[in-house]
Swiss-Prot record:
GO cellular component, one term: photoreceptor disc membrane
Keyword Zinc-finger attached: no
Subcellular location: Membrane; Cell projection, Cilium, Photoreceptor outer segment
Name of this protein: Rhodopsin
Length: 348
């Protein structure tokens, strides 16, 4: 084995020289230089400084402006809540541990940090699944006279939390476990060992199949059908130009969110899968640290995409920030905002 396994950790460093110490008790400077730990801390500080204000602002602006409280926006707000979970439950912890060079909060703190990070990532993933299904139903019209209303949005939000908890909670109750990963300053699912005592192998397989592969299949199916339908409708001019433009704008925004999610999380998932399927292989701490910390940047991109691509929300945000006046003088809802207030499908 090219790593060192302890009762509640796995350090990707051979202990032939006897230098490996518990990541809960001693600095891990034999894994990387102190300045590299400082760089991780600086990166986490940047994510906190950017992630908290922009996600909090998303929630606050929506509460302040009634016209933003639409069914589709419930799902988008759910993403902001998930991102705040990651900021408070994960980023602040990792910032502190990186400054110390090891996970100073012990196994209990590791469980909490790993839980919040996993929960936030999974809520984001399943929110994108719900958005993909909503876009598919609204644009592709597989059901006639269907109206995506408030109750559907609430059920969609509840579904994302149930599925996220089904992934994040089991390691807390004995099915798999959370351990420090990479440079041992943040925690995640144990992809490094089989650990039969906690049935780790079965959980990792379950996680990759149910909480990554299936959501990706659903998302790609929905958007594959959606692209085909939009092209067909444009060719046949089945919808008004205003309706087509509005639906295209919303669809484009959601697709960009999916692409951004894939860019952030696929490297992490790929490295984790490689480590799990190549038990005992030789890899350094940076190998897992870089994709893990890159994935954490997902807490920033969703609200940025939403603000940049939703004119109605952008106007409301500027009005809120400028004490009730929009400096751009454009305070009317865009076609996207008015169209998505209640998504409706008429008979094809």
């Amino acid at each position: 084995m090219n790593g060192t396994e302890g009762p509640n950790f796995y350090v990707p460093f051979s202990n032939k020289t006897g230098v490996v110490r518990s990541p809960f008790e001693y600095p891990q400077y034999y894994l990387a230089e102190p300045w590299q730990f400082s760089m991780l801390a600086a990166y986490m500080f940047l994510l906190i400084v950017l992630g908290f204000p922009i996600n909090f602002l998303t929630l606050y602006v929506t509460v302040q402006h009634k016209k933003l409280r639409t069914p589709l926006n419930y799902i988008l707000l759910n993403l902001a809540v998930a991102d705040l979970f990651m900021v408070f439950g994960g980023f602040t912890t990792t910032l502190y541990t990186s400054l110390h060079g090891y996970f100073v909060f012990g196994p209990t703190g590791c469980n909490l940090e790993g839980f919040f990070a996993t929960l936030g990532g999974e809520i984001a993933l399943w929110s994108l699944v719900v958005l993909a299904i909503e876009r598919y139903v609204v644009v592709c019209k597989p059901m006639s006279n269907f109206r995506f209303g408030e109750n559907h949005a609430i059920m969609g939000v509840a579904f994302t939390w149930v599925m996220a908890l089904a992934c994040a909670a089991p390691p807390l109750v004995g099915w798999s476990r959370y351990i420090p990963e990479g440079m041992q300053c943040s925690c995640g699912i144990d992809y490094y060992t089989l650990k039969p005592e906690v049935n780790n192998e079965s959980f990792v397989i379950y996680m990759f199949v149910v909480h990554f592969t299936i959501p990706m299949i659903v998302i790609f199916f929905c958007y594959g059908q959606l692209v085909f339908t939009v092209k067909e409708a444009a060719a046949q001019q089945q919808e008004s130009a205003t309706t087509q433009k509005a639906e295209k704008e919303v669809t484009r925004m959601v697709i960009i969110m999916v692409i951004a999610f894939l860019i952030c999380w696929v490297p992490y998932a790929s490295v984790a899968f490689y480590i799990f399927t190549h038990q005992g292989s030789n890899f350094g701490p940076i190998f897992m640290t870089l994709p893990a910390f890159f994935a954490k940047s997902s807490s920033i991109y969703n609200p940025v995409i939403y603000i940049m691509m939703n004119k109605q929300f952008r106007n409301c945000m500027l009005t809120t920030l400028c004490c009730g006046k929009n400096p751009l003088g454009d305070d009317e809802a865009s076609t996207t905002g008015s169209k998505t207030e209640t998504s409706q499908v008429a008979p094809a």
